[in-house]
Amino acid sequence: MEQMGVYSTIHHPSNDRLEVVRERIKDIELEEVQNLEDAWLALDSGDLDLVLAPANLVWNDRIKLASMQFDVVAALTRNHPHHVLVSEDGLEHFPAGGIVLCDEPLIHRQIRRRRNKIDIRKFDTMEIEPTTAEGLRTAQNLIQSGEINGFVTHRGAYDAAGLNGRRHALHNDPEARGLPRFVPTPFCDLIVIIARQGYPGHTLSDWTDEHAFNSWIVQRTVMHRTPAELHEFVGIHYRQQQIGSILTEAERVNDLFILDNLIDPEGDVDDQPRYEIIVELLSKDGLRTTSIERIGPISRLSVDIQFMMNDWNSILERFMTEADGFIQP
């Protein structure tokens, strides 16, 4: 029987996610691991055959994993690939100077873009540790006492900490046309499976998700092709849908970009499932944005993402070299 190490954080609760698919996992024994360094050593020695871990941490260890000849071979279904604002009111109803706690540089800029007069602070200014359930509950108590107006956390962390305050999704909402959007941080809500090179990832298909694995491939590619000093300021949205669902949504909100991409001049539409990718960078004050978007058949994803990144690099080169270029850390 194979052994799989499972590593969880409050933002990416891998154990909780596994409960949904546990009945479909065959011939694999699960073992909770306390830190990733030990997990990599166990995978290298053969004590483990697989490791399940948050994709953002796997990305951070990418150089080490490449040197150890490990590969990401599959991913779990994403539930809520976005952050939430825990607050009694949405951003549109915040008072001028309202206080929000947020440790994500990208979301800091996105909030500035939506409401420039909000006071955005880091959690440590209130001596709060946002990676623990206790810390998040303390932040919720500060809302109730009126010391702050809200705070930003992962949707998964909201559930894991047992929070019950009102929450507002910070995502790319098609219904909110005309309002600045929230493109997710890289690898948000993405949990992946790592194995030694050569492992047959297709044998895990009964309980893993191709959509999520494609999301890993796309986000990894975007990050590889984006200068490292900009990584914490880039937002990446990826989803795939059947053509009927995409058209229904686009027609409801009158999204001409999507409709023009999917319907040919004769009014015909093929029935291939489509991917949607949005990559975005914001200026420090959140007032200027550069982005690139693509929609296409999933069958062309591996080719299209490379052409898209060529265009993305051309955009970045222009804005990083101009005298008034605004894409700065």
Give residue ranges: language-model regions.
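Flexible hinge/capping segments at coil-to-helix
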Residues: H83-V100
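Short beta-strand-centered segments that line the small-molecule binding cleft or hinge
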Residues: A39-V84
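Structural motif
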Residues: L52, L101, V152-H154
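Small-molecule-sensing regulatory modules
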Residues: M1-G46, R109, R113-P329
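Short, polar loop motifs at secondary-structure junctions
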Residues: A55-V58, D103-H108
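A short alpha->loop->secondary-structure connector
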Residues: S67-V73, H93-F94, R114-D124
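Short beta-strand->loop
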Residues: G5-H11, G97-E104
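Small-molecule pocket liners
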Residues: F70, N79-E88, R181, F187-I193
